[in-house]
Amino acid sequence: MQAPFIDWAQEPDRYLREILGDRADGLNPLRSMWDRGIVIADGSDAPCTRPDPIRGMHLAVNHPNPAQRLTPYEALLMRTRNAAWLGFDERERGTLAPGKRADFTLLDADPLTIPPQSIGDIRVTGLYLRARRIPPQAGGVAHVILRALAGGKSRK
């Protein structure tokens, strides 16, 4: 799934409603899939949408169709445990446990305890790859993502 498509600017809600009518309410059926036991993960489909996990979590929890909203915990699982499991990488990633990679972020608020509508305001205050703190990068998010994909190494 790609929760960021819930508010994708290239397909505004008005446009989808003109074409699909009431069926537009069934787009991105997160809750329906979750309740049927389908393991779903969330991604951004960058560069079509921003590679912003916090925004994806916010959209999954604040889905415009209330019947399709996930809890904050479920939205977090989509980006962590479920993503690792679907990528056949659950032995190394997805949860924090001895022997795993220990890739994680520090946030300025707990998405499980703040009001759901505030999740999108959370800011990342630290990034760790393989349990090593990655200092803030001048290149911003794109540089950090590329570094993470390279296993924590930068090309010079």
Predicted regions and their residues:
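His/Asp/Glu-enriched, well-ordered alpha-helical/loop segment
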Residues: 1-113, 122-130, 134
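Glycine- and charge-enriched low-complexity intrinsically disordered segments
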Residues: 133-152
